[in-house]
Regions:
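Short, well-ordered beta-strand segments enriched in hydrophobic/aromatic residues
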Residues: 48-61
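Bacterial Sec-dependent N-terminal signal peptides
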Residues: 1-26
Length: 181
């Protein structure tokens, strides 16, 4: 009986500590970014990674498709935390194509004012620090976000990934190089 009691106590504390070790923050803001139509909805610091929940809405102009008919994120995208030169690399994306030298992939938009929600997953960053998301520091058209902040007291519950992207299917187009051609 005492072994069962000890196991139950250990499990209880493990679960309690596990829940406290992760944090989710809604209402993240950034000082400078690529477009006011790009939103950072939530930052989740999970056990092994940091997930950034985002949304983009195409412009409501008649010529929306001249500037906003597609989007993607480069495979070298990373997070840099304030006061550090360490790069926390993007691990994967959910509902957003990753573009690389070997394979060009794009999310294609169908109409003006179209909203698309997606998630970028990075190596785990330290909690409570402001950070930047850098796609390409040398490209003025890249998705670079500077001064991303969130309030640690604005803790929120985890977002269900399937529900988050359910209404926003990705329409992907791609091409790749074979033998240099």
């Amino acid at each position: 009986m005492s072994k069962l009691y000890i196991i139950c106590i250990i499990l209880f504390y493990s679960l309690f500590i596990g829940v406290k070790a992760h944090a989710q923050y809604a209402g993240a803001k950034y000082e400078k970014g690529p477009s006011p139509k790009m939103e950072i909805l939530q930052v989740d610091n999970r056990e092994l990674s940091t997930m950034v929940y985002m949304a983009y809405t195409t412009p409501d102009a008649d010529n929306w498709n001249e500037t906003s008919s597609w989007m993607n994120f480069g495979d070298k995208t990373f997070i840099q935390v304030e006061g550090s030169s360490k790069q926390y690399h993007m691990i994967s994306t959910i509902n957003m194509p990753i573009n690389s030298e070997a394979e060009n992939k794009y999310m294609m938009f169908d109409r003006r004012n179209q909203r698309h929600q997606f998630i970028l997953e990075f190596e785990k960053i330290p909690e409570g620090k402001s950070f930047d998301i850098i796609e390409d520091v040398n490209n003025p058209n890249a998705f670079n976000f500077y001064g991303i902040t969130y309030t640690p007291t604005d803790s929120n519950s985890y977002v269900d990934v399937d529900e988050f992207i359910a209404g926003y299917p990705v329409k992907e187009m791609g091409r790749y190089v074979v033998k240099g051609n």
